[in-house]
Every structure is written in structure tokens, then in C-alpha cells.
Amino acid sequence: MEHGDRHITVVDEHGNEQLCEILFTFESDDFGKSYVFYYPVGVEAEDENGETEVHVSAFIPGDENKEGELLPIETEEEWDMIEEVWNTFCAEQEEEDDE
């Protein structure tokens, strides 16, 4: 994972690179990890309902000379916590849109 201000380059298992925009990041004290929500840039990522597919991964930030690393979500407890964060984010976005 290459980490820019608002973009990352994700490399899949086949070595293909995909530029993605970072939606937001957060840290979990409970799991001792950082997480990133992101989605592909410049591709038809919307489904038939006009919704964009958003991905989430744990990540280790890189330093000045090293790329960061995306990690898989490992447990159901992690997924439950991530779902809560996502639902809170979506609710806040809806409130902002209503204003």
C-alpha cells in the first residue's frame, strides 16, 4: 500500500495496482489497530443502485521511506466494531446532507 494524503495504491493478489481514495481512517484502542475505509477511483464502482463499493482494511502506516501495509480483518468482533463505525459515519453524513 502506498499512502498519500487522500489516495492509496492497492495491489491485489495478482499484482494489479488500483488507485483508491481514502474515505476516512480511524484507530481502535480495543484492537490496537488502525483502519482505513477506501474506494476505487476512476472506475465504474457503482452498483445498480448507484452505490459505490467501499472497502475496509486494517493498516500499518508507512514511514518516510517505506510503504504502508493493508491487513485483512481477522475476527467477527473486529467486523462488528467496524460495522458500528461505518453506521455512525453514514448517519453523520446523512445529517450533514439534510442541513
Curated annotation (Swiss-Prot):
Pfam families: DUF1292
InterPro entries assigned: UPF0473
Superkingdom assignment: Bacteria
HAMAP family: UPF0473
Recorded family membership: Belongs to the UPF0473 family.
Protein name: UPF0473 protein GK2553
Taxonomic path: Bacteria, Bacillati, Bacillota, Bacilli, Bacillales
